Amino acid sequence: AQGIVLVEGKSDVTFLRHAASSLKQSGALPASLEDVKIVPVLIGGCGSVKHWVTLNLAKDLGLPWCVFLDSDIGGDPAQVLSIQKRKKEVEEAGKVFFATRKREIENYLCPDLIEEITGVAVTFTDTCDAKKIIGRAVGMKPDNVLDKFWPQMTSERIISRSTYHDGTQERSELVEILSDIVSMTR
């Protein structure tokens, strides 16, 4: 490994790897995570980030590192506060902390894709519990939703579902985050 991204769980690994590979294939990203040997490392809940910082674990590996977490916006306010605290700790350590603009990674899934695959129309917002809503609608465990559908998201859909407006400018959150991550080792 040439660098690491600290993430909460296995779905985050699927999310980042697939998005980077798809965006690279379409030319929206210069490289995939594998190309630049950046490895997502599962650390469990957001509370573990604090220990990685205070115990210098990532630093002791001698590799560039950053953190990628769900923002949980629209969820438990205490959790949102906890994530903001972790962000401050990571940034004070001189590292980059990425929190999703949407509540969780499942909120980036394309409802049309889910309907194409399952025949079930599902509606969700950027800040609702999409994982639960989709899971209930299609009859699967919420924790399996991302791993089932995300690998079938095209680059076009990934860009479309992560587009936001910054003033008059249209930007793609996932292209920006992944560009920063893949350039971390350069």
Language model features with spans:
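Acidic, divalent-metal-binding catalytic cores of TOPRIM
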Residues: 1-186
